[in-house]
Amino acid sequence: RLDWIFDSDASSLAERYDRWASTYDTDHDEWGWRGPHAAAECLMLHGSGSVVLDAGCGTGQVGVALRSCGFEGDLIGVDFSSGMLATAARQGVYDQLVHATILDLPLAESSVDAVISTGVFTHGHVGGEAFSELVRVGGHGSVAVITVRQDIADDLMVDAETLEAAGRWQLVERSKPQQLHPSRDEVLQSLVVW
């Protein structure tokens, strides 16, 4: 299924996620996907504030992980797949779910204290050009925890470094590459904190 997703073009990606929504969580449980829990724990260590944006929330795995880590504030989930959002709504952990892309978030400037995103900045999905939008809604002093695949990290980090040079973002931590998706031995990811 992952190859089916990664091989799709931008116009068919949302539709493929809509079709996958009913088995997405089961599939990822079978594959041992640890990204949501690792990112949630990382965000809680760095301070979540009271309003968190789950950018590319999918079926709500990150929201569930955040709540299980003790996050009690407002949780906003954004995703471009209506099927995924319907599944996320059934999780009962989000205060607000929004159908939108990360490139054009319908949120006010500086409206969230933290951003979390797992499995989104990857092949055929979202590139580093979306970082400026996350910075916009987070504002000064916000925290962002994002999983970044090592095979595309250099390309993504160019956009992050541009924001850093402009004084809009500051790299806080980048974990060593790890297997967050054990079923895909070749895929290593880091948790990056800004």
Regions found by a protein language model. Give the residues of each.
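Conserved SAM-binding loop and adjacent beta-strand
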Residues: D25-A40
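Conserved beta-strand signature within the Rossmann-like core of class I S-adenosyl-L-methionine
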Residues: G141-R149
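Class I S-adenosyl-L-methionine
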Residues: R168-W194
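A short SAM/SAH-binding and catalytic strip from SAM-dependent methyltransferases
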Residues: A114-G127
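A short glycine-rich, Lys/Arg-flanked "PGG" loop and its adjoining helix->strand segment in the class I
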Residues: E129-H140
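Class I SAM-dependent methyltransferase SAM/SAH-binding core
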Residues: L53-D104
